[in-house]
Amino acid sequence: MIASNEYVIGVDYGSDSVRTIVADAHNGNEIASSVYYYPRWKEQLYCNAAINQFRQHPLDYVEGLEETIKQCLTQAGAAVAANIKAISVDTTGSTPVAVDKTGSPLALLPGFENNPNAMFVLWKDHTSVEEAAEINAHAGKFDTNYLQFVGGIYSSEWFWAKLLHVLRKDEQVRGSIYSFVEHCDWIPFLLTGGNDVAQMKRGVCAAGHKILWAKEWGGLPPNEWFASLDPLLDGFTSRLFKETYTSDQAAGTISKEWASRLGLPETVVIGVGAMDAHMGAVGGQIEPYYLSKVMGTSTCDMLVAPADEVEGKLVAGICGQVNGSIIPGMIGMEAGQSAFGDAYAWFKKVLTWPLQNILSKSSIVSLDVVKQLVEETADKIIPELSRQAEQLSIEDVGELAVDWFNGRRTPDANQLMTGAVIGMDLGTDAPKIFRAIVEATCFGAKAIVERFVEQGIPVKGLIGMGGVARKSPFIMQMMADVMNMPIRIHKSEQTCALGAAMFAATAAGIFNKVEDAMNAMGQGFDAEYHPNPEKVSFYRKRYEQYKQLGKFIEQHTNGGKKDEVLEPEQLAMDSEQLVMAVNSEK
């Protein structure tokens, strides 16, 4: 029996905030929790949505780390604080930053404080689309396919594309950068008091899925592969890493400085970091061949399989398959959608535009009342749209959408792809458009399952986690109907932070392996959605229409090549054929 006076801390860095929990290592019960919204990010400093630039200042992360842990320890009390055994961290990814030789992000150094290129390049930053395209073209020139374990396509959301973009665009950063570091590797390094980036323990999770590390070729691709891509990368691999570590291992122990700042014992173990969805899958009690879907602003879909059962199988077009990236000893496979909750948030933003831009100038209503009206309306829009969309008869459905509002992550990454809604007429209203967007996100999820199955990886069921999964029965029921399989919703509202806590307990030696931590600390499931047999065939036909529309978009945006001119006559002819094909299925 594990002593009940052992506690661990799980820290979950999301896109907008950092969430920290203190959990009982015996049963996973949440003792305390705290959320910190990044103040600079909230003001959208250093970001430019028009060019898909999204950067985050390291101070948002550092301040959030200290604030949330201190708040948790205040809630939990001195007795709990004295018995904290370990801390583990998950973050978004790929979210890398330029650092100096000591491992300090350049944005923390004089002269770089307000330079976006010296900050963390958030996962959804798509400024490096051209660099990603160059990497993909370059990879085809070599006998060894160094992209084979990342689905065969390198994304603009990932490490090397972002590094190359920063090096090309910023002479100041280029002259001061020593290495490039993922967020999930930097926080443990910070907590352990690291001052030499060469000693930083890099997690296999980010290394395998985003940085092209693989044991099959002895680590990273050879220097000549990168040097021939661009001379700016010549020699860079020597300043990165050769070894990687799974997240059940310790990165070290907390430094005296951080122990003092946080009020923790100097014996606290710091675990090796990983990306949020991977630790979230563990927090959500993932099982072999069950697709674990972390559904928030985007989705990250995780699947684990015993290494001996999938040996030799490479799944094309996903975000990678890496031994030990989720559960040590199993192949962790990652896929996902670039916009899920963000697609709904975009439509909400469109609908609230008049309130934000016209009502605020009203001479009839005070600014305080306007602010209250905007906040109240914004809070109610998605729930009300969901309620009315749910009441729509499927016989009346005409609108059809594609969910690539932030590009396409999986299958077959292409961040230049765009969303679309067709089939609208003068009877189309907001609930109908919203329903089409929700349906499209569910179809995008189905495309991922279809890809796994086509490539010989069975999907036995679905596990739902995250804000959308817990807050929207309408979306989850449609997901079950579209997928034609049940989806279980995990009870924990903080599966990523809980997963981090499970890894912390394992790194501290409280458990021998993370599966034991899952069994002891897992909170179970509190909802399950089953497909409605009356709607399954309807959605099967609609899904074929979705694929036709997606194919049309891909063909007629020239695969995202905006410098090519479309032939109007051919476009009109193909558009007419698309509409006829869609209408014929009604």
Question: What are these language model-derived features?
Answer:
Residues 1-108, 235-238, 260, 264-269, ...:
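N-terminal glycine/serine-rich phosphate-binding loop of ATP-dependent small-molecule kinases
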Residues 13-15, 137, 142-274, 358, ...:
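Gly/Ser/Thr-rich active-site cleft segment
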Residues 19-21, 192-197, 365, 369-419:
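Conserved ATP-utilizing enzyme core subdomain
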Residues 58, 78-158:
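Active-site phosphate-binding/coordination module
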Residues 133, 275, 279-283, 341, ...:
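Glycine-rich phosphate-binding/hydrolytic loop that grips phosphoryl groups
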Residues 157, 335, 343-345, 350-372, ...:
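Acidic, glycine/GT-rich loop-and beta-edge segments that sit at the periphery of enzyme/chaperone cores
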Residues 158, 212-328, 338-339, 351, ...:
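ATP-dependent carbohydrate kinase catalytic cores
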Residues 390-489:
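Activation-segment/catalytic-loop signature of the eukaryotic protein kinase fold
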